[in-house]
Amino acid sequence: EVWKPHHLERDGNIELVATTLRRLHALPLTGRSFDSTVAARRYVATINNRDTALVAHCERVIERMRLPHNLCCCHNDLVAENIITAPGMMFLDWEYACDNDPLFDLATIVEHHDLGEEAAFRLLDAYFDGDGLRWQPKLREQQDLYLALYWLWLASRPDSTQDELDALGRRIER
């Protein structure tokens, strides 16, 4: 079964995602590292958006983030539609997979689906076997990075609507 965002709300599914992510992150390194600055520049080069202040803000957020020291094999595009159960959980669509901070995968799940604080903490706590509180500040950094990249990506796409960009922009500003 291909997941939809509502699957994340079902009992035990967030914990199942965390467990599956731990297995993914234990795989050998790919030898390619995710460079958010290069990705951002590629998106910015094709943006026709008049919100130059938000573009600049997103670029600053991304530039502040440095390549993490704790690299692991990451999916980097974990949206619900890239998760299936058949009967175990598997991830699809590996085109963005490369080495990155493991918390970027968690941040993608949290921010792409606009999970609330409680669900975000459950994911983090399950991923770190009950030690999620200690990792909340690092997750927040990765959430900010994901939102900035996601907004730039969305702004670079001709099929994106202004309503989508505005809604995501409000989330970035909170």
Language model: regions and residue ranges:
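An alpha-helical support segment within catalytic cores of ATP-dependent transferases
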Residues: L27-N76, A86
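Active-site activation/catalytic loop segments of kinase-like enzymes and analogous catalytic loops
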Residues: L103-D131, D144-S160
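Pre-DFG segment of protein kinase catalytic domains
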Residues: C73, M90-D93
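Conserved protein kinase catalytic core
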Residues: I83, D99-D101
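Conserved protein kinase catalytic/activation segment
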Residues: N82-F91
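ATP-binding pocket architecture of kinase catalytic cores
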Residues: E1-F34, R50, P68
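ATP/Mg2+ or Mg2+-diphosphate-binding catalytic cores
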Residues: T52-A53, L152-R174
